[in-house]
Amino acid sequence: MAAQGCAASRLLQLLLQLLLLLLLLAAGGARARWRGEGTSAHLRDIFLGRCAEYRALLSPEQRNKNCTAIWEAFKVALDKDPCSVLPSDYDLFINLSRHSIPRDKSLFWENSHLLVNSFADNTRRFMPLSDVLYGRVADFLSWCRQKNDSGLDYQSCPTSEDCENNPVDSFWKRASIQYSKDSSGVIHVMLNGSEPTGAYPIKGFFADYEIPNLQKEKITRIEIWVMHEIGGPNVESCGEGSMKVLEKRLKDMGFQYSCINDYRPVKLLQCVDHSTHPDCALKSAAAATQRKAPSLYTEQRAGLIIPLFLVLASRTQL
């Protein structure tokens, strides 16, 4: 009986261990499959809301965009395997949402997303990709279908590290190509000179999808702004490191270009939140004018005193 009891006890322990193993496997299966963020909550509502709001920014002849049709065209990618979505899957979406970009208003960027959005000021100053309709509806969002199901995956979505043809990267590739083709006049580019890997990513959306699709006959020149973060390192500036690669590439392509370190209007915007930082101690002509103002005022007063005495003297004689 004792032997039978021990055998039963060992069997129970084995069953418990097996159950624990099954639970661990189930928990592992529930973990995020992909490296990226899952589908944004309320994706459809956000998309349609942004689309409806953006139409007011368009010229009257372009405001007849059908947001529902644009969503349905976008949703085609949500019906595909999350590693089998191609840039061309967004062709209809782009065609339905595309509109003209004002001349001289295009603003390309790398590693400066928030600063670009702030400086563009909702299309008032510039119109970067995130401020055209097809970019606005997807900015800062994530989306994908579940791997083996038709529902959306709210837990994780693939990045380029998981697979090349993922929904989000393919979207921005297609959008970047269209944005480049529609840009004209003076092309502006904002790069991050504090980025550890260099201001100009040799492999990136700007290098791989935007520069190759610029329409040379529509472009006057390219103006590059290399911005440095307030208090951050000065890793690269114009003519240094990866910037030399970019400048040579543009020159070889026949583009006229210029490069400016810490473009003043953008620098002033950066300093709004860092007004007391040494990087924001601007030595401007205005400050020099203010310092000289008292002496100028004194000279003006002195110049007025002599005529005043003459007037008083003439009245006394009368």
From Swiss-Prot:
Signal peptide bounds: 1-32
Lipid linkage positions (GPI-anchor amidated alanine): A293
Record protein name field: ADP-ribosyl cyclase/cyclic ADP-ribose hydrolase 2
Its job: Catalyzes both the synthesis of cyclic ADP-beta-D-ribose (cADPR) from NAD(+), and its hydrolysis to ADP-D-ribose (ADPR). Cyclic ADPR is known to serve as an endogenous second messenger that elicits calcium release from intracellular stores, and thus regulates the mobilization of intracellular calcium. May be involved in pre-B-cell growth.
Disulfide feature: C51-C67, C83-C163, C144-C157, C238-C259, C271-C280
Comment on pH dependence: Optimum pH is 6.5.
Complexes and interactors: Homodimer.
Organism: Homo sapiens
Binding positions (NAD(+)): W109, W172, E210
Tissue: Expressed in various tissues including placenta, lung, liver and kidney.
Positions of the propeptide segment: 294-318
Entries under CDD domains matching the protein: Rib_hydrolase
Primary location: membrane
EC nos: 3.2.2.6
